[in-house]
């Protein structure tokens, strides 16, 4: 799920919108404690889908540079970028991660 074609996903400290754990967009699931990197990203997809407030605000992220500490590794910010820019619906992503 690499969304760099639509949103640049960078590291905190650059200019952009932070989506790390210090924001409502952050992934509350931790690599190691809650599973592998892929598992916590999949869990985040389901979490996002169940969070009506975030889904209602997702367009705030459209076209923005999303910043998280994970980059350059795979990151939940890629999920946010895909949905915010209309490349995937949250329902499509939930279906993908539950297959």
Task: Give, region by region, the residue ranges found by the protein language model.
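Catalytic phosphate/metal-binding cores of nucleic-acid and nucleotide-processing enzymes, i.e., regions
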Residues: 1-99
